[in-house]
Curated annotation (Swiss-Prot):
Reaction catalyzed: a jasmonate + an L-alpha-amino acid + ATP = a jasmonyl-L-amino acid + AMP + diphosphate + H(+)
UniProt similarity note: Belongs to the IAA-amido conjugating enzyme family.
Top enzyme class: ligase
Induction: At low level by auxin. Induced by methyl jasmonate (MeJA), red light, far-red light and blue light. Induced by wounding and infection by the rice blast fungus Magnaporthe oryzae. Induced by elicitors from oral secretions of armyworm caterpillars (Spodoptera mauritia).
Residues where jasmonate binds: 95, 321-324, 326
Taxonomic classification: Eukaryota, Viridiplantae, Streptophyta, Embryophyta, Tracheophyta
Entry keywords, A to Z: ATP-binding, Developmental protein, Growth regulation, Jasmonic acid signaling pathway, Ligase, Nucleotide-binding, Plant defense, Stress response
Residues reported to bind an L-alpha-amino acid: 159-163, 534-538
Domain of life: Eukaryota
Gene behind the chain: GH3.5
EC assignment: 6.3.2.52
Name used for this protein in its record: Jasmonoyl--L-amino acid synthetase GH3.5
GO molecular function terms noted in the UniProt entry: acid-amino acid ligase activity; ATP binding; jasmonoyl-L-amino acid ligase activity
An example Gene Ontology biological process: response to light stimulus
């Protein structure tokens, strides 16, 4: 993409957002026209109408369970217009990391186009601040296994649905985001071999790399933790021009061997830089001197990885990628200079039809920083009707058969850009920890871990990763928090951490229940190093893609395999005494 076309993209964005209400009206009309024959819409009596008033009065708000019977028919091979006018030929699989069961979500060419619109917009603003010109991107991206459903529909992750399309590849060329690695590495049969070769290809093209990317911050941190373990092997491969025997997949070996040539000078340079680093601080700019930034989704459940990612990135800016889900895109990051913790997303009014359910916390019940699930809901409002400073749940209508679909995301309106809102992601609304009247979300858990981990700072330790579980086999039930640490901590410190975790859950339902002993003392369980990598491997064995993996912050009892992995890796256990028992 030239600077000129970046300007054109920004100008188009400015034009569309100046008249967001009209664009929303036109977008809904377009969606309803092309899907007028859909059984789902007809069942609710829409009758071909395309205006917002008729649409909202006929079609109810929904969650995935409501539309699952329709999608299951598509999975089973029903080619009639079930949720869209044209038959659905591809399905995306959501991650399924919490419950162990992925969801099927319809995918079509229109969703591909909205993806490219989102990417082009954020790239244009990014390139204005950090121009990259010609070059390559070190991308830790991975395809996943494709499955054919009973009805002959191709199902895979949303990212793989993109990577396998020629139109997507062309779009990535336009925005200077070509991956260093050949397709055979991206679609390799073994994640560990693909990761190794991503690192290798990145080093081979180290002078040409202008950006470092993965879908999620977790994948970036995992990549460089792996680099710490294999960097000497990578140097040997580059010095000798021979790919390590640990890469056994023929497709990967053949593709990477074509670009791997003996280069002792480069190997020596990498070796000297690595041994000169202090605890791997700034490894990314040291080895990729022309990289302008590190890019990926860094909000929500990815925030706990930012500290480690900043360590690897040194002085390079971290830029949070765009806001969306497998169900569809919402907004672009148009201010890449803002740190991830403060990032906002401008909603693109042409990529879907958006509504927002106003959420209010009961007066006096919640503290300012609590992300509790307690909310009073009002009727949904339109994109241009939201108010700055207020919080909402996002509702999306997309081009692929989701109508008034509740995403379950809580957002705050930070400001308006022209007439479209800029959203700040607050948390997933879904409940994580609950025993009786207590209600805590993923954000509450994250805040509790941040607070309790301060006790580790004196021993220069950090929480590498964490998750949680509700233990109901005892009476009363209790919260169980699992930590994987960077090293060994004393019993005294970990006991303090357990108490701090217990006290950090400030939801009134929790504190009241603890005081009257209807919830038992919180338990902190310490895990062996490598436990979360084992959970990742389990996820991959189910056909998931690492670029889609999110550590489950809460493990549902139905996810027995992950619970088994956690249980057999517990090395120490500490019960809170914060409430005196």
């Amino acid at each position: 993409m030239t600077i000129c076309s970046c300007e054109e993209t920004i100008n188009e964005f400015e034009m569309l957002t100046r008249d967001a209400a009209r664009v929303q009206k036109d977008t809904l009309k377009k969606i309803l026209e092309i899907n007028a024959s859909a059984e789902y819409l007809q069942n609710f009596g829409l009758g071909g109408r395309t205006d917002a008033e008729s649409y909202k009065s006929c079609i109810p708000l929904c969650v995935h369970n409501d539309i699952e019977p329709y999608i299951q028919r598509i999975v089973d091979g029903d080619t009639s217009p079930v949720v869209t006018g044209e038959p659905i030929t591809n399905l995306s699989l959501s991650s399924g990391t919490t419950h162990g069961k992925p969801k099927f979500i319809p995918f079509n060419d229109e969703l591909l186009e909205t993806t490219l619109q989102i990417y082009r917009t954020s790239y244009a603003f990014r390139n204005r601040e950090y121009p990259i010109g010609q070059g390559k991107a070190l991308q830790f991206v991975y395809g996943s296994k494709q499955v054919i459903t009973k009805g002959g529909i191709l199902a895979t992750t949303a990212t793989t649905n993109l990577y396998r399309r020629q139109r997507y590849k062309e779009g990535m060329k336009d925005i200077q985001s070509q991956c260093c690695s050949p397709d055979e590495v991206i679609f390799g049969p073994d994640f560990h071999q693909s990761l190794y070769c991503h690192l290798l290809c990145g080093l081979i093209y180290s002078e040409e790399v202008h950006s470092v990317f993965s879908t999620f911050a977790h994948s970036l941190v995992h990549a460089f933790q792996t680099f710490e373990e294999v960097w000497e092997d990578l140097c040997t491969d580059i010095r000798d021009g021979v790919l390590s025997k640990k890469v056994t997949a023929p497709s990967i070996r053949e593709a990477v061997s074509k670009i791997l040539k003996p280069n002792p000078e480069l190997a020596d340079s990498i070796y000297k830089k690595c041994i000169g680093l202090s605890n791997w601080y700034g490894v990314i700019p040291a080895l990729w001197p022309n990289a302008k930034y590190v890019y990926g989704i860094m909000t929500g459940s990815m925030e706990p990885y930012l500290k480690k990612l900043r360590h690897y990135a040194g002085n390079l800016p971290l830029i949070s990628a765009d806001y969306g889900a497998s169900e569809g895109w919402v907004g672009s990051n148009i201010d890449p200079t803002v740190p991830p913790e403060q990032v906002t997303y401008a909603v693109l009014p042409q990529v879907g039809y958006f509504e927002f359910i106003p959420l209010e916390k009961p007066i006096g019940e919640e503290t300012e920083n609590s992300a509790s699930i307690h909310y009073i809901e009002s009727d949904p409002v339109g994109l241009t009707e939201v108010e700055v400073g207020k919080i909402y749940e996002v509702v999306i209508t997309n081009f692929a058969g989701l109508y008034r679909y509740r995403l379950g995301d809580v957002v705050k309106i930070a400001r308006f850009h022209n007439s479209t809102p800029e959203l700040q992601f607050i948390c997933r609304r879904s409940l994580v920890l609950s025993i009786n009247i207590d209600k805590n979300t993923e954000k509450d858990l994250q805040l509790a871990v941040e607070e309790a981990s301060k006790f580790l700072e004196g021993e220069k330790l950090e929480v590498m990763d964490f998750t949680s579980f509700v233990e109901r086999s005892s009476d009363p039930g209790r919260y169980v928090i699992f930590w994987e640490l960077s090293g060994d901590a004393s019993d005294e410190v970990l006991s303090s951490c357990a108490n701090a975790l217990d006290l950090a859950f400030i939801d009134a339902g929790y504190t009241g229940s603890r005081k009257i002993k209807t919830i038992g003392p919180l338990e902190l369980r310490i895990l062996r190093k490598g436990t979360f990598k084992e959970i990742l491997d389990h996820f991959l064995s189910l056909g998931g893609a690492v670029s889609q993996f999110k550590t489950p912050r809460f493990v549902n009892p139905s996810n027995s395999k992950v619970l088994q992995i956690l249980s057999r890796n517990v090395t120490q256990s500490y019960f809170s005494t914060a409430y005196g028992f």
